[in-house]
Amino acid sequence: MARIKYTTELDAETSAKAMGSELHISPKKSRELCKAIKGMRTNAARQYLEDVVILKQAVPFGRHNDSLGHRKGPMAAGRYPVKVASEMLKLLKNAESNAEYKGLNPEHMFIAHTAMNRGRVIHGMRPRARGRASPENTETVNLEMIISEVR
């Protein structure tokens, strides 16, 4: 596996980083959730992600929204990406732990940067009738998050 770098760099003294590589989650849903939580305070983002996991709050889908129904609130189309939200919640907790290790207070921080990049494709084959086989590939995602102190 190649070394993955962060797509942006912020002030190292006032920020903390976390990265998840080759996660088995949807790239499209990851993009929409990254867009939804960027700029939130860490407490609000943690509560939002927990609400998504228990299907209480929907994530607005701006790009990948064909044949999606409307949801409650100010959004038009939305979904409940539970698997992506649980992985993003782990990433947020990791970033908060890194902030505590650096001597920062995670209660006074916000999500300054989130990004997703497609990871490698895990190739697989599914046996079919009459000796044939069909490809069954698994997409992976690399997530990154940087939290920074509120100025």
From Swiss-Prot:
Which is an annotated GO molecular function term of this record?
structural constituent of ribosome
Which UniProt key words apply to this protein? Ribonucleoprotein, Ribosomal protein, RNA-binding, rRNA-binding
Specify the superkingdom: Archaea
What InterPro entries does the entry give?
Ribosomal_uL22, Ribosomal_uL22_euk/arc, Ribosomal_uL22_sf
Q: Name one GO biological process term.
A: cytoplasmic translation
Instruction: Determine if Heme is one of this entry's keywords.
Output: no
Q: Name one GO cellular component term.
A: cytosolic large ribosomal subunit
Xref: CDD domains: Ribosomal_L22
Q: What does the UniProt function comment say about this protein?
A: This protein binds specifically to 23S rRNA. It makes multiple contacts with different domains of the 23S rRNA in the assembled 50S subunit and ribosome.
Give the record's subunit note: Part of the 50S ribosomal subunit.
Give the family this protein belongs to, as stated in its UniProt record. Belongs to the universal ribosomal protein uL22 family.
What's the name of the protein?
A: Large ribosomal subunit protein uL22
Provenance organism = Methanococcoides burtonii (strain DSM 6242 / NBRC 107633 / OCM 468 / ACE-M)
